Amino acid sequence: MAVKEVRLYLCPVPPSVALSVGDADADEPMIYFENITECLTDASCDKLACFAELKQEQALFMKKLYKHMVLKSDGAYNKHHVLFDLMVMYKTYVQLADESAFGSNVLHYCEQFITGAFEVFGLGSRVAVLVPPGWENDNLSVLLKHLHGLHLIAIDIVQ
């Protein structure tokens, strides 16, 4: 049986690469982080509203993770994949978190959630993240190095 591989392009996709696209995106649930950002930055926002937004985020991630393990477990992507959503979540929370113990905990729990999702996805597919030269200058590089160190992803530099 052939090994399935998901290739995630965080850089321009070479012309020789055919991206995987299909009808599966039509009913794809969207994960919006703006609502959580608003809840955390607006002092007048009710704490239960923030809790509800976080629960909605978790539910959507679980739904998309399952769907993509079934329908998007092989191919090349530059968008419309749950693993991209996880990276966007990380970048969003890095920007929101401060240097406090609470901020550190938020990033730590976010990293744990993302690690778990990549572990689950990795049960059925190899994951390669393709990055441009200089990729280490982005705050996402911390997460990518972490996942690479756990052998959950391969990192390939595209020239």
UniProtKB/Swiss-Prot annotation:
One matching Pfam family is: AcMNPV_P18
Q: Which InterPro entries does the protein's record reference?
A: AcMNPV_P18
Instruction: Indicate what this protein is called per its UniProt record.
Output: P18 protein
Native organism: Orgyia pseudotsugata multicapsid polyhedrosis virus (OpMNPV)
Which gene underlies this protein? P18
